[in-house]
Amino acid sequence: MDTAEEDICRVCRSEGTPEKPLYHPCVCTGSIKFIHQECLVQWLKHSRKEYCELCKHRFAFTPIYSPDMPSRLPIQDIFAGLVTSIGTAIRYWFHYTLVAFAWLGVVPLTACRIYKCLFTGSVSSLLTLPLDMLSTENLLADCLQGCFVVTCTLCAFISLVWLREQIVHGGAPIWLEHAAPPFNAAGHHQNEAPAGGNGAENVAADQPANPPAENAVVGENPDAQDDQAEEEEEDNEEEDDAGVEDAADANNGAQDDMNWNALEWDRAAEELTWERMLGLDGSLVFLEHVFWVVSLNTLFILVFAFCPYHIGHFSLVGLGFEEHVQASHFEGLITTIVGYILLAITLIICHGLATLVKFHRSRRLLGVCYIVVKVSLLVVVEIGVFPLICGWWLDICSLEMFDATLKDRELSFQSAPGTTMFLHWLVGMVYVFYFASFILLLREVLRPGVLWFLRNLNDPDFNPVQEMIHLPIYRHLRRFILSVIVFGSIVLLMLWLPIRIIKSVLPNFLPYNVMLYSDAPVSELSLELLLLQVVLPALLEQRTHEAVAEGLVRAWTVTAGYLLDLHSYLLGDQEENENSANQQVNNNQHARNNNAIPVVGEGLHAAHQAILQQGGPVGFQPYRRPLNFPLRIFLLIVFMCITLLIASLICLTLPVFAGRWLMSFWTGTAKIHELYTAACGLYVCWLTIRAVTVMVAWMPQGRRVVFQKVKEWSLMIMKTLIVAVLLAGVVPLLLGLLFELVIVAPLRVPLDQTPLFYPWQDWALGVLHAKIIAAITLMGPQWWLKTVIEQVYANGIRNIDLHYIVRKLAAPVISVLLLSLCVPYVIASGVVPLLGVTAEMQNLVHRRIYPFLLMVVVLMAILSFQVRQFKRLYEHIKNDKYLVGQRLVNYERKSGKQGSSPPPPQSSQE
């Protein structure tokens, strides 16, 4: 039935003509077999693909050249094309050099020089600033310091924009945006004010209906609602007179917002891309952006660094605390923080004065500035000061564990204050992170509402920045003090007290050996690489840790609940859990009635305060209160403390003891860093616990199933051991030895000395190199090694294919490495002596043949790359001068040469 009249184009549905013939360029058949070349080119432009989307066959075009094209391009054409390409490359090189010089040289250098000029504190520095800009002294150091300054200013700018969005979307505090009072001049205000004023009060009024222990919000005490109600009442009494003017200002601001042309902003955002802003598109518009970035840096340095620093400096000098601040080694940071504190106090005082004299615009501006300073200080306290306190407290409580004293810590701080503070801050951050993770784990196990006094980080309504904006300072100060007490008490319970018990019961167990140098015959570098590349990935990549921890917590909770008759309080009752869905629906309906959408007069504040002051957690489950409930809660806390103490004792002793015992078979009586012993012991303990849990899970299935499982796992372990010996033993050893012969030995060992090879160190370095090569291979293009590695990863350990790994991965890699090691050795030791050269020449060849052959291979790769590039240039010159068109190639099923023609350049299809 295939006739010429029935063959139509799959795109335009037209028949072929002598001017526009039909082609069948892919595997597709039927009504979509044929297509016009023009239709296909248009579709390829639209889809931006070079293959058929149905059969995945790549379309092929054959070039059509001018009839007068010579068989070989003339030299002058090649030379002209080469000159043109070189000129284009030079132009791009100059442009990108200018871009790099502007962004990596001018911007950071200008920021650094202006920063130094402002903080020098002399008029002469301002006068000599233009000359200092052109100075080449300390150029690299100033550029690096300037990059840090620019990063800080950009972060400050982004933070300000983000804080503005938080205020716009979350609403400003009630003392900054309060409701307009009712008055008779406008009837709509009489309706708006009571509704807006009751928006947050209804929430607080309905809260006592719930259990008091369940009503506190994240991180707040039960009296939080009373405090907030008092604040709202005081603010309303203080600022009632200014409500009408503020409402008018708000309406004017809303009208201004409506006057913005959103289309113009969208068009500007579309035009300004990263390439255009940075100058990577070839234009010089980026010079304007460089000017604005320099101006922004100067403005932010002046406003956010210079002014607060000098305010704090003058205040400290006036109060006589200058010497104490200088002794802290952080004079600039402390002085700037003091300046911000004084600036916040000044702003809130000026805000109060502006409220009294009814300067409404000034009052709002001062209030917004105070919010910015307040949030900045709270962020510094939450992210900087609190982890630092936790880190130092952890160090102080663990001094006896490392046989250290406060004098040692003082000396280390005096020698390197910045490094010491950073390490303590890092330790504190890790401690806070794992504590928060443990709290999240507890929330998954315990009944909703048990941890009412702690923040719920999983709550979708939880927004710490909004709390920083709305809650007063004394609430944050109270929360900070309580957090310090709680975290400090936990450190005492789980670190200081177990150390005292260990020193009393096992006096020879402590201190831990944490010396940087040891007399062990094993290389520290090898142990570190083994720890980082083998042990830690095996421990951290396991997904069962969270499930095991959750199971332990649940088992402890069930045990404590039945012992103290608190099962209903901790986990809830089963029959009540069945009705939890209805209870949650009722709670949500109750919250929906209370959290009514506020009217315009209240703004966004009432809605946000309804979130901050909402009642108990969503999905609250009632519980049964047994007799002597407070006493049982006290016993529960005591039982929890004892459990944490025992768990801490086990974690501090068992892994280290097991690691020391295992490492003693390897190193003898030599002392090893406790990091390695603890990691080794922890790894062994994890393997033991994992094996025991697996066996316990298999026991209920019967003896035959257990034997079958043991047989399967034994076979899998044998296969894994064989693969580990090949891929984690032989390959890293050969790779490390090759690296030693090619790089290390020629650079470190003179010709008149004999190099010594340590297989253990070579293997450890080979493990590192093998992981790097595997990572680069997986990130690179598709080739046989990447395909094999991806297949091995996809199979996993349980579906390990020993034959496939040995045949496709281990054998080729080991063969290449052995050839790389043996061929140069055979040439140097077997072929060169036959040439009759001297012994010195033989030694030179033997020592330098490995790097020489590496250079030969690299040179051949470079030459091959240059040949390919020249061929591409040749084709490009020929196409530019003589190419007149392209013809679509039909798919030939029998010949199979449908892809023989090279694909056309993209420019020819446009």
From Swiss-Prot:
Q: Which InterPro entries match?
A: MARCHF6-like_C, Znf_RING-CH, Znf_RING/FYVE/PHD
Could you tell me the EC number(s) of this protein? 2.3.2.27
Acidic residues: compositionally biased ranges: 223-248
Catalytic activities: S-ubiquitinyl-[E2 ubiquitin-conjugating enzyme]-L-cysteine + [acceptor protein]-L-lysine = [E2 ubiquitin-conjugating enzyme]-L-cysteine + N(6)-ubiquitinyl-[acceptor protein]-L-lysine
Question: Signal sequence: where?
Answer: none
Protein's UniProt keywords contain Ribonucleoprotein: no
Name the top EC class: transferase
Q: Which residue ranges does the entry give as Cytoplasmic-facing topology?
A: 1-91, 164-283, 358-376, 443-480, 541-632, 700-721, 786-815, 870-910
Output the Gene3D superfamilies linked to this UniProt entry: Zinc/RING finger domain, C3HC4 (zinc finger)
Q: What is known of its domains?
A: The RING-CH-type zinc finger domain is required for E3 ligase activity.
Q: What does the sequence similarity comment in the record state about its family?
A: Belongs to the DOA10/MARCHF6 family.
In Swiss-Prot or TrEMBL terms, this protein is called E3 ubiquitin-protein ligase MARCHF6
Q: Which SMART domains match?
A: RINGv
Please give the organism. Pongo abelii (Sumatran orangutan)
How does the annotation summarize its subunit structure? Interacts with DIO2. Interacts with SQLE.
Extracellular-side stretches of the chain, per the record, are 113-142, 305-336, 398-421, 502-519, 654-678, 743-764, 837-848
Query: Mind telling me which residue stretches traverse the membrane in this protein?
Result: 92-112, 143-163, 284-304, 337-357, 377-397, 422-442, 481-501, 520-540, 633-653, 679-699, 722-742, 765-785, 816-836, 849-869
Q: Where does Zn(2+) 2 bind?
A: 26, 28, 52, 55
